[in-house]
Amino acid sequence: MTHAKLVIIGSGPAGYTAAIYASRALLTPVLFEGFFSGIAGGQLMTTTEVENFPGFPEGVLGHQLMDLMKTQAQRFGTQVLSKDITAVDFSVRPFVLKSGKETFTCDACIIATGASAKRLSIPGAGDNEFWQKGVTACAVCDGASPIFRDKDLFVVGGGDSALEEAMFLTRYGKRVFVVHRRDTLRASKVMVNKAQANEKIFFLWNSEIVKISGDTLVRSIDIYNNVDETTTTMEAAGVFFAIGHQPNTAFLGGQVALDENGYIITEKGSSRTSVPGVFAAGDVQDKYYRQAITSAGSGCMAALDAERFLEN
């Protein structure tokens, strides 16, 4: 059984920033960056260019930013483990963390596990149907696949993520359709203007994909218009979901207070959770801002809160 003063679960901007601050405070943190549960480095690993992170006037690729943060955390003594924490016991002291058959203990814990992309429950989108055979939730991860080249592609969603995915896919697809169930977008004006100016992007308003069909790969979709109540079949090679995220909190087993959507509840103005010694940072506790810079800031808060807790 391995013991650490501080364990950080998660490896996005929140987790790495917490590790930087904690290691500089000589807390020798152990950071579990994940393995099977999701890509190490969090959602920014699937983002192309990040243009709004301070200090990079020309922008920076998401994975490069995460690599830099990881290197900085390790420079100050953070131990990074490519393992998943699958269960926790916060009812005992020290806390007990499970990773497969391994057991770890810690005096304080920062949860920075982020959130995962949601998927539509429609015919053809299941794991045993066309998931990863033309249906995905990450254009950056999968968009360059040969199956999408010079084909009609469809992005479901109306926020910034949906438009970013659509613009990325114009590099590969013949046409990219943004399918939105309303007649206005939630995305920022800057993103809307960019997408509307792209001659390869088209918008299907008041529309919903109700079925995905194909053989070994996606070949077509059925689109329902919720205004005129008609259904149209269109050729398609790819369907990309960009409809929001689900916080990665299931492994906590209800031991930390969550809101109705599964996000960790933290005390106002702090990273403290309902369990003393357990702190939360990043998108796992933030459903409003969801930015790399705010995640990093909350990671700093969590490290400082953990340091004060351990001192007392």
Swiss-Prot record:
Its main location: cytoplasm. SUPFAM superfamilies: FAD/NAD(P)-binding domain (SSF51905). Binds 1 FAD per subunit. Gene3D superfamilies: FAD/NAD(P)-binding domain (3.50.50.60). GO terms for biological process: cell redox homeostasis; removal of superoxide radicals. FAD binds at residues 33-43, 283-292. PROSITE patterns: PYRIDINE_REDOX_2. It catalyses: [thioredoxin]-dithiol + NADP(+) = [thioredoxin]-disulfide + NADPH + H(+). Keywords: Cytoplasm, Disulfide bond, FAD, Flavoprotein, NADP, Oxidoreductase, Redox-active center. Its cofactor is FAD. It is an enzyme of class 1 (oxidoreductase). Its EC number is 1.8.1.9. One of its GO terms (molecular function) is thioredoxin-disulfide reductase (NADPH) activity. Pfam families: Pyr_redox_2. It comes from the Bacteria. The keyword Chaperone does not apply. It is found in: Cytoplasm. GO terms for cellular component: cytoplasm. The keyword NAD does not apply. Disulfide bonds join C138-C141. Belongs to the class-II pyridine nucleotide-disulfide oxidoreductase family. Homodimer. The active site is a redox-active disulfide bond. This is Thioredoxin reductase. The gene is trxB.
